[in-house]
């Protein structure tokens, strides 16, 4: 959050706090949009929405990374908010996608596992990203963030052909 902004982009801590807050707000709006788009355009296929969100996350983090430290604050704001808009969709939809694919037989287990991995990844990403940034620099931290977004997109792509849920197959 603020450390990344101040150390890699030279943003003051007061501006960094505001940027992080706006990132979170953009994330909430993106999460709501991802849910709506899943229902409206992708016929409940949350995994497809996640593909687009992860691609957007990778793109906007890359663009943010490439901005020079003396870039206008509004440009940092725009790219960071766009990244936040894309990042929160998969976080909200992964539990739904897993529960829908698992059907009622294992929906609670699927949701529990996605929650477990979500919390574990938060712990690992905080420590891991800090380690990479401290020992190898922020450029490698950005590479790691973008790399994980691409890996996430590829994992969701594996489900591209899946139905919105497994309930039809369960009754057949």
Q: Which functions belong to the PLM regions below?
A:
Residues 1-15:
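Short amphipathic helix-loop junctions that connect adjacent transmembrane helices
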Residues 31, 104-136:
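A late C-terminal transmembrane helix in Major Facilitator Superfamily
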Residues 31-44, 133-134:
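Helix-to-loop junctions at the C-terminal end of transmembrane segments
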Residues 40-54:
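Cytoplasmic membrane-interface "Motif A"-like loop-to-helix N-cap segments
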Residues 43, 98-107:
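Paired intracellular helix-loop junctions of major facilitator superfamily
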Residues 45-48, 130-148:
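A membrane-interface helix-boundary motif in multi-pass transporters
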Residues 55-69:
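C-terminal ends and interior cores of transmembrane alpha-helices
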Residues 64-68, 138, 144-172:
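Multi-pass alpha-helical transporter architecture, strongest
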């Amino acid at each position: 959050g603020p450390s990344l902004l101040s150390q890699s982009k030279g943003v003051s801590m007061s501006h960094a706090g505001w940027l992080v807050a706006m990132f979170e707000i953009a994330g909430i709006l993106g999460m709501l949009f991802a849910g709506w788009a899943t229902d409206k355009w992708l016929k409940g296929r949350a995994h497809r929405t996640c593909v687009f969100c992860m691609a957007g996350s990778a793109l906007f983090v890359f663009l943010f990374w490439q901005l020079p430290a003396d870039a206008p604050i509004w440009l940092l704001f725009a790219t960071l908010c766009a990244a936040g808009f894309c990042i929160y969709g998969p976080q909200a939809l992964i539990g739904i996608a897993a529960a829908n694919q698992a059907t009622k037989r294992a929906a609670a287990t699927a949701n529990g596992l996605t929650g477990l991995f979500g919390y574990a990844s938060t712990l690992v990403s905080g420590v891991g990203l800090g380690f990479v940034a401290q020992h190898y620099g922020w450029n490698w931290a950005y590479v790691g963030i973008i790399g994980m977004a691409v890996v996430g997109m590829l994992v969701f792509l594996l489900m591209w052909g899946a139905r919105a849920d497994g309930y039809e197959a369960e009754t057949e």
